[in-house]
């Protein structure tokens, strides 16, 4: 069940038996933000952050500011969805700039992408407009701190756990180290259980270790399917 900041404030005060005078909103909100950030510091790929975005390339334009595509934290894949499109391969920027250099930097269909300076680079730079779909993990949203009736941007697993972090900080503020440590352990244990459940591999798609699955190289693709395009 989702929880809002308003509900979180009430829940915490009820659990520690304090009123708004003794535990003002500003303190609860500060601790809530800290616990929220601690959870997101553990993983960059929480399932709740999964998103898909689309954009169109511009002829002869290599770089695209990531923030104009979406509020992206980490890109997983870039796919050219045109008729003869393909999934682009990630390439290191240093390697790419050494290949597409001088007279060799000719505009054509891009097959590679890289990141640098908060921008997405396409290699080669597009010769025409290509529709692209980006699968990515977005950044966490903090609007729940100002819109107190908006659900906190966490998986519901953590909505029941976050109060324990705030309570631990409240008792720490009151210099009650025993109760603070007890509630922090409850928070840490709850987060560990949630993390294990949310991040484990799907039973329908077991983890394949290195060497267990072969992927065609771009060269092989060009020798087979690519030559018929």
In which residue ranges do the predicted regions lie?
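Glycine-enriched, solvent-exposed interface loops adjoining structured elements
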Residues: 1-229
């Amino acid at each position: 069940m989702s929880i809002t900041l308003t509900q979180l404030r009430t829940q915490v005060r009820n659990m520690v038996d304090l009123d708004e005078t003794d535990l003002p909103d500003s303190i609860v909100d500060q601790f809530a933000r800290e616990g929220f950030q601690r959870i997101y510091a553990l993983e960059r790929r929480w399932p709740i952050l999964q998103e898909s975005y689309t954009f169109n390339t511009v002829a002869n334009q290599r770089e695209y500011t990531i923030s104009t595509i979406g509020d992206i934290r980490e890109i997983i894949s870039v796919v050219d969805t045109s008729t003869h499109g393909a999934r682009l391969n990630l390439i290191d920027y240093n390697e790419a700039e050494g290949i597409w250099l001088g007279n060799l930097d000719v505009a054509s269909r891009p097959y590679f992408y890289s990141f640098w300076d908060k921008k997405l680079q396409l290699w080669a730079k597009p010769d025409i407009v290509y529709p692209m779909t980006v699968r990515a993990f977005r950044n966490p949203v903090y609007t729940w701190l100002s819109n107190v009736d908006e659900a906190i941007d966490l998986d519901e697993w953590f909505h029941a756990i976050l109060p324990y972090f705030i309570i631990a900080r409240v008792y720490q503020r009151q210099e009650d180290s025993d109760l603070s440590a007890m509630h922090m352990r409850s928070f840490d244990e709850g987060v560990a259980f949630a993390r294990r459940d949310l991040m484990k591999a799907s039973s329908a798609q077991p983890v394949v270790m290195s060497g267990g699955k072969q992927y065609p190289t771009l060269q092989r693709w060009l020798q087979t399917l690519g030559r018929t395009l």
